[in-house]
């Protein structure tokens, strides 16, 4: 099991949690982004830099993903592709995307896109607070404990 991170939009506090989990649990964490990022020195943390472009990082994650891998992303269409390929998707707020909920989440996203396109100002999500950070950490710990077997 590996952890893939849609790193361009992933908040720094979430990356820090992932870095700690990588070393503690000895699980491979790979950040994928269209620009280089600073990562701590660790045999478990990797960086993949892809060319700039629409969905290039997403496509790279899906290409490299194996069934059972975890992907950290707030990108709902990417989460849907991950689930279709047998992976698991977790957003930075600690919400797990599943086969049971991804279709309704995609529908809500499409509805909000339609609203914005018609001129309705919907606002964006609030900044990640302590409760979301804790929810993410808890969900990540549960997943890693259940699915990762250190070599």
Curated annotation (Swiss-Prot):
Matching Pfam families: DUF188
Source taxon at top rank: Bacteria
Signal peptide extent: none
Transmembrane segments: none
Family: Belongs to the UPF0178 family.
Database matches in NCBIfam families: PRK00124.1 (NF001095)
PANTHER family per record: UPF0178 PROTEIN YAII
Protein name: UPF0178 protein Swoo_1444
């Amino acid at each position: 099991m590996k952890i893939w991170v849609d790193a361009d939009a992933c908040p720094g506090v979430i990356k820090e949690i992932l870095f700690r989990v990588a070393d503690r649990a000895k699980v491979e964490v790979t950040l994928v982004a269209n620009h280089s990022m600073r990562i701590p020195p660790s045999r478990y943390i990797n960086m993949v830099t892809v060319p700039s472009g629409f969905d290039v990082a997403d496509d790279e994650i899906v290409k490299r993903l194996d069934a059972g891998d975890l992907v950290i992303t707030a990108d709902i269409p990417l989460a849907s592709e991950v689930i279709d390929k047998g992976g698991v998707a977790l957003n930075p707020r600690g919400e797990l995307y599943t086969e049971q909920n991804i279709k309704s989440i995609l529908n809500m996203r499409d509805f909000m896109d339609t609203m914005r396109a018609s001129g309705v100002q919907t606002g964006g999500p609030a900044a990640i607070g302590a409760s979301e950070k804790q929810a993410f950490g808890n969900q990540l710990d549960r997943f890693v404990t259940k699915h990762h077997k250190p070599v």
